[in-house]
Amino acid sequence: MHKIIKLNLLTLCICAANQSYALQALNDQILSDVTGQDGISITHEASKVDIKQLNWVDPAEVGKTPIKLGLHNIEVKTATGYNNIKTKLDFDVGTTQLANGTQGVGIQLSASVSPFTATAAQIMLMCSPNCATGETDQNLGSFKLSTISPFEVYLATTNGLFNRDSKVHLDFKLQNASISYGQNNQDLTLKDFNFNLSADGYLYIDETEGVVLTSKGSVGDNIVVLGRVEDKTDVHDSRVGNATNPGLNVDLRYGSANSTHRNLIRIGASGALTNGKIALNADQTGVAKFNTVNRVNGNVQENEVVASAGYGFKNAGGLHLNVSADFTRAGNSLLGAGTPTTFELGHTGTGSYAIEFSNLSPLNVRTSTDPNSAINSQNAYIDFGQIYINNIRTNSMGFVVNDQIKTILGAQNYELIYNPSPTGNASNMAFIAVRGLDFQAIARKARFISDNSIAVNNTNEGTWGLGIPIYNLNANAAFFAKKYTNTAGTVKDGLGYDIAVSTDGYGEDSQGNPKTTSIIVIDGAMSKHGEEVNYYTGLRNIDSYFKANGVIGFNENEIYIKADSLLFAANAEIAIGQLPGSLYNCPAGVNTCAKEVVPINNFAKKDDVLASIAFMLDGKGELFIIPGLEAAGGTPQSNYLSFKSNFEFNTLSSTDLSNESKKGSFISLSNTDSNGTTTKTSSFNLNKMQGHLGLNGKIQMQKDAVVMDNQVQFNHKALAGGQGTAFRAEVALSPTGTMQKVADIAITGGAMRSTLGITPR
């Protein structure tokens, strides 16, 4: 025993002596120079990483077994042209200085990952080992993430790590990535995905909001920049070195891993944002709360209603997220040399075109009825509301709608109770809820742009614009595994869904500024008063409710969406006029006239309304989304988005057919007249709609126009070679509020074709 100890000591001494060349004496002066200013740097390299399971365990409902959502059989490999996956982390604590000159004592953290490809063979929703009767673990599909540019994150603080009163700087660079969701050897892919963000702001922990990252603090706001990113794929020779994609780029493609992906749609955003905020916590108590907005005699009434059914999981925990930001436009005091916010929307792939939207503004042009008051300088904005993510197990859930939708549906209560489960029993599902999403932005300028695969499209910025603001959107979405049968009769795996969505048509904030859900086109030509005239036309103040459940399947060359049940109800105003706060234009032939402001609450009035439209469609349907072809030399004539769909109305019983108060599926055009004391509403109606309709179409984004070709089939099955059902409806008038039947109509077959081309000036 003693000999062994002596031998070990001898061995230690020999090893120490052998390595003594690496050691040197340090005096006090040298020690005083060691400040740790270089921090800690960690570099890790791997040729491959395998992970069997990566699971998120949701506590679900109190007293019940948890549900897991995870990525299984993960494989991370190097990207083509790289030997290893290189991960580097630099961490330093001490004196810091941000790019804007702010100094302090905090941390600097820099992390990067070289290009890689990560694949998860299964996205699993698991109840095991405690599955209830009839429940099984569910495979929801596959996931893949790959990059061709390094993924980089940089964070610098000026006072510790979390401090609501001291600035931080964040760079987040996920550039030229590819993110795919797969089913049946087909992938829905975000190609050239960018989330390229640079921001100054504040990072802190709040007792209510949780972890908060915001650009706005007690001493003012800062800029968040979505910087454009160099396009490294499919760039035209004339644009090499200058081709860029938006800082937030969502480019949807579809196809198998071994084929050229086809083209769906592209959405992008770039430029400077303000009042940006991200908050993350586990508080789920708000998931059962619905804010609804009712309109009574032109007055707005906002109410909070707590749903009673299906939200027992709110006391157990989950993920709660809030994201919001304001858009900037020319003249914003924080912009400096920065670029205002722009949106891009259009087709994608070789030879494609899109529309760039700019001058993002609120609905109201002014905030005062004084004709000499300044133009509204408030920002347009997006607030994604309160987002809740959970794994749930239920077969009953409540969803609250406003008074307008309750009337259209003929519902007894504001809370609509439904079963989101694919069976009659409670099932485990992945669940996402949104409460109070607002997108209040009008794009008053627009121009056509070209894809980087072709030469630059040098069209001038037009005087037209588009507004698709959304007010108080609430949504429930549940997802689960579900089988379906394709057109060839083959049973395939699909993603089951159950979705409920609602919007409110009109509301006002605490200062009386209007909010709306609308789809309007803007004419921003100059008026006789020397400012934009702001004519608009379209559907405004849209109250809507959409409820569907079914399955999403990935077929070869097409995306298949089946709705086993589909209910869509809405009420809107068909209107033409000028935006609130604009100056009324002078009459034709008159060059000068007195300045008068369009009322700020103009959207709450009926002055611009041509008619109101309301409808309810209740039945089932199918939608086939067919992506555009991707090929060298592609053009809008070969690369376009098309679709085929059909909808079958629910059959009414003989009792309901003979009951005039039962409208079934209907469309109504109405007009309201008022003499100041009494109001009368008359309407023209198509009630009790039945049959099987088909709708096919294609959308072509051209160099300077949008062209839509459509075909409506009045007896879908008959035209498809089967035994069909004629389209039938009841024509009725309601001149005094009482429904009066005029006639029955039936269309036994045939198709109606139309082509709509929109060429802005």
Where are these regions (language model features)?
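N-terminal low-complexity, acidic/Ser/Thr/Gly/Pro-rich segments
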Residues: 25-26, 33-761
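Gram-negative bacterial Sec-dependent N-terminal signal peptides
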Residues: 1-25
